[in-house]
């Protein structure tokens, strides 16, 4: 499954990107609420769903320290996520948030771990993956690769997962993990429509073509 990351600054931008993502072959849509210039986030989610008739919409409000744009109060962020969950099929919750059980979304959850510095050892990654899976409906483990050994390690974590798992490595040298992870059983991968939201991210069209070629 290809999840297109939508990074529009306005609701109109989000809708335009959503339509483009569907045309490029996306299977699901991630609405990056932290990119919106206003807080009318429920309306943005509804607009994306209505314009595409998509059944799979992911709501993400990523805080700055995890690569997002949200700089506001954390309690406010969690309040927003809980509220907008009624308009989404999945809400992305960071592992530390899920562990504290502060909020109870009314949809399924992707419990995520992001490491922008490195890729931890295999056993540590497996522990993180399993904890994410225990707390959510889908586990997501994303790390920064400093070489191919790191990339292969994250792929092994995906390959051996028993629960639905998203996993890949960031960085130019490891961009292939975004495609290979799906081919070896990963639940999904993320792709850009225009503006890339993470290091090494491919576009929806690039991802789809590679999956068709290699699959």
Curated annotation (Swiss-Prot):
Claim: Amino-acid biosynthesis is one of the keywords in the record: yes
Organism: Methanopyrus kandleri (strain AV19 / DSM 6324 / JCM 9639 / NBRC 100938)
CDD domains: DHQase_I
Upper taxonomic lineage: Archaea, Methanobacteriati, Methanobacteriota, Methanomada group, Methanopyri
Complexes and interactors: Homodimer.
InterPro entries for this protein: Aldolase_TIM, DHquinase_I, Type-I_3-dehydroquinase
Family to which this protein belongs: Belongs to the type-I 3-dehydroquinase family.
Binding residues for 3-dehydroquinate: 30-32, 62, 178, 201
Domain of life of the source: Archaea
Protein name, per record: 3-dehydroquinate dehydratase
SUPFAM superfamilies according to UniProt: Aldolase
